[in-house]
Amino acid sequence: MSQAEFDKAAEDVKHLKTKPADDEMLYIYSHYKQATVGDINTERPGLLDLRGKAKWDAWNQLKGTSKEDAMKAYVNKVEDLKKKYGI
């Protein structure tokens, strides 16, 4: 998986005709963060930040996943979303 393919997928996902479902967006977010930052490096958000906690939990589940694997999963998911929602 090349950085260029990953960067293209990151741009493509911004131009989907329809916004993906929340679970799909969490998948995209968590794999993007794992590919670009690595293992989670922040504290879990507070009790009232439900959206922040969901994003944190999704990213935290990928702890230990390699950058390459996260990039590959991200690009594959974006390709699926492009077929499902159009671009």
Swiss-Prot record:
ACB domain sequence ranges: 2-87
GO biological process: fatty acid metabolic process
Keywords: Acetylation, Endoplasmic reticulum, Golgi apparatus, Hydroxylation, Lipid-binding, Phosphoprotein, Transport
CDD domains for the chain: ACBP
Record PTM N6-(2-hydroxyisobutyryl)lysine, positions in chain: 55
N6-succinyllysine sites (modified residues): 8, 17, 55, 77
Modified residues (Phosphotyrosine): 29
Positions carrying N6-acetyllysine: 8, 19, 55, 77
Pfam families to which the protein is assigned, alphabetical: ACBP (PF00887)
Residues recorded as bearing N-acetylserine in the entry: 2
SUPFAM superfamilies cross-referenced by the UniProt entry: Acyl-CoA binding protein
Primary location class: endoplasmic reticulum
Subcellular location: Endoplasmic reticulum; Golgi apparatus
Binding residues annotated for an acyl-CoA, in chain numbering: 14, 29-33, 55, 74
One annotated GO molecular function: fatty-acyl-CoA binding
InterPro entries linked to this entry: Acyl-CoA-binding_prot_CS (IPR022408), Acyl-CoA-binding_protein (IPR000582), Acyl-CoA-binding_sf (IPR035984), FERM/acyl-CoA-bd_prot_sf (IPR014352)
PTM-bearing positions, type N6-malonyllysine: 55
Function: Binds medium- and long-chain acyl-CoA esters with very high affinity and may function as an intracellular carrier of acyl-CoA esters.
UniProt record similarity statement: Belongs to the ACBP family.
Subunit relationships: Monomer.
Name under which the protein is recorded: Acyl-CoA-binding protein
Organism from which the protein derives: Canis lupus familiaris
Gene designation: DBI
